[in-house]
Amino acid sequence: MRQSIFFMPTLKETPADAVAKSHQVMLRGGYIRQVTAGVYSYLPLGYKVLRKTEKIIEEEMANAGVVEMIMPHMLPASMWEESGRLPKYGPEMFRLKDRHGREMLLGPTHEETFTDVVAKSLKSYKQMPLQLYQIQTKFRDENRPRFGLLRGREFVMLDGYSFAASQEQLDKQFDDEKAAYLKIFKRTGVEVRPVIADSGTMGGKNSIEFQAPAAVGEDTIATNASGTYAANLEMAVSVDTFKQEPEELKAMEKVATPGCDSIDKLAEFLQVPATRIVKSVLYIVDEKKKVLVLIRADKEVNEVKLTHLLDCDSLRVAETSDLEELTGAGKGGVGPVNADWADEIVADKTVKGLYNVVVGAGESDAQFINANLDRDFKADRFADLRVANEGEPDPVDHEPLKFTTSIEVGHIFKLGTYYTETMGAKFLDQNGKSQPVIMGSYGIGVTRLLSAVVEQHATENGVAWPKEIAPFGIHIIQMKMKDEIQSKLAEDLEAKFAKYDVLYDDRNERPGVKFNDADLVGAPIRITVGRDAADGIVEVKRPGDDQAQKLAVADLEDFIANELD
């Protein structure tokens, strides 16, 4: 490809609103252009990277026995009503009506659509296992689109779905998809960590995220040094090392605590450590159930874990008005003693083994001291409900947890029968008995993956693309376009190495302009044809090299084959 005819509108200055490095590089290099907030055009350079990435996905999916198809972008809302997900998705769903007033939506994901097809087609266990996928543009009405392709309102995604007649089949499908995803990420050059994750609105109980460490990441992952534990912070578990020595139970006593509207103020006023205070947090669950959560005051409630425990669609911390109406106490005064108004009391495991603690007295500006579990208050059940902290021991090898910001580039789920039971996807088993199909769901954010690659492979002046997804494998730069010897050599090299996808800079531009643009193209090999062309010598530079090296043209073939084959 001749650069003189290749549409690559580069920018000299970094746009002020581009915060992420990947966003800056893609704008400056002419990979993408914003159409509106969260919506981008993929210019030729960006589209080449996108298509090469999709080709890798297609190859690895085929190797894993996953079959490609395509579903419509516009879906009937009735399908999402049937699955029960429509009210859960909230304002991120793009909704519209057709001319007949029928509710429609733009698909953010396609579990319902695939399940509907399968429900009408799969009738016997003999038709399974089955694995399908598509690569398609998705839509989400993000409240704050940002960081370029990392959080957009329109994006390209691989979404796949598996259908099994048994749990054993699903387990194998899940493992096969995980292995295929790791191969995809390796070939695209992105470092990822598979981590324990929350399934969110997708349904199901078991899921793994593929997280790419990056400074601009919106997620945080918790890992240990030996690599035996990795989890999204939302689901991370740590070992609580605090232990209170057993002591004689004292008589519970109510004390006034005026102005103590925080744990720090309360601890200072009563001259006790936060570890001797049990805070009570009232949650309104699914807008009807009142659940009081107890946790040691030096810890914070993990609401994702709480959602899993309660198996609810929504929860929120009660407003001050709710507290006053239900308990007669304002913020800080709510407590578990005589809390008959609560539908359920759940406690974090940190509450066990505490003696003579401070709890809310059920009225404003008052606390009970020397309160004790079982004697003075109770909990209906205990669970790990706390946010893990960096440095705490992991639950596997008891090594200190390390927190890293990261980008979620993939997510796989064991959905079970979450969708198939509600949507009637059943089959006849070997005994002729009707059973719900067992599902898995699998996704890669393809355009987000491109941003993650740039975040990890950014250079001082551009990007060093991994060889399999680089827009061009070789970038030939001719220094003087009027020099016939240089032109002849550059054209010969372009033809000889055409299979590596060559970009030939044949523009009448200053060397500085050409080299600056070359940094943004980020080809694995840059060949400069200059003053030594008459002697059969060129300069070769890889993105990681400090300086270019001179190389005889006769040695180029072996050098390039070693780098790119």
From Swiss-Prot:
Q: Which GO terms describe its molecular function?
A: aminoacyl-tRNA deacylase activity; ATP binding; catalytic activity, acting on a protein; proline-tRNA ligase activity; transferase activity
Which InterPro entries does the record cross-reference, listed alphabetically?
Answer: aa-tRNA-synt_IIb, aa-tRNA-synth_II, aa-tRNA-synth_II/BPL/LPL, Anticodon-bd, Anticodon-bd_dom_sf, Pro-tRNA-ligase_IIa, Pro-tRNA-synth_IIa_bac-type, Pro-tRNA-Synthase_IIa_type1
Ligase found in the keyword field? yes
One of the GO BP terms on file:
prolyl-tRNA aminoacylation
Cite the Pfam families for this sequence.
HGTP_anticodon (PF03129), tRNA-synt_2b (PF00587), tRNA_edit (PF04073)
**Chief localisation class:** cytoplasm
Cellular component annotations (GO), alphabetically ordered: cytosol
**Cellular localization per UniProt:** Cytoplasm
Name the catalysed reactions: tRNA(Pro) + L-proline + ATP = L-prolyl-tRNA(Pro) + AMP + diphosphate
The enzyme's main class, written as a single word, is ligase
Enzyme nomenclature, EC number: 6.1.1.15
* Record keywords, A-Z: Aminoacyl-tRNA synthetase, ATP-binding, Cytoplasm, Ligase, Nucleotide-binding, Protein biosynthesis
Q: How does it assemble?
A: Homodimer.
Protein family per UniProt: Belongs to the class-II aminoacyl-tRNA synthetase family. ProS type 1 subfamily.
> What the record says about its domains?
Consists of three domains: the N-terminal catalytic domain, the editing domain and the C-terminal anticodon-binding domain.
Protein role: Catalyzes the attachment of proline to tRNA(Pro) in a two-step reaction: proline is first activated by ATP to form Pro-AMP and then transferred to the acceptor end of tRNA(Pro). As ProRS can inadvertently accommodate and process non-cognate amino acids such as alanine and cysteine, to avoid such errors it has two additional distinct editing activities against alanine. One activity is designated as 'pretransfer' editing and involves the tRNA(Pro)-independent hydrolysis of activated Ala-AMP.
Specify the protein name: Proline--tRNA ligase
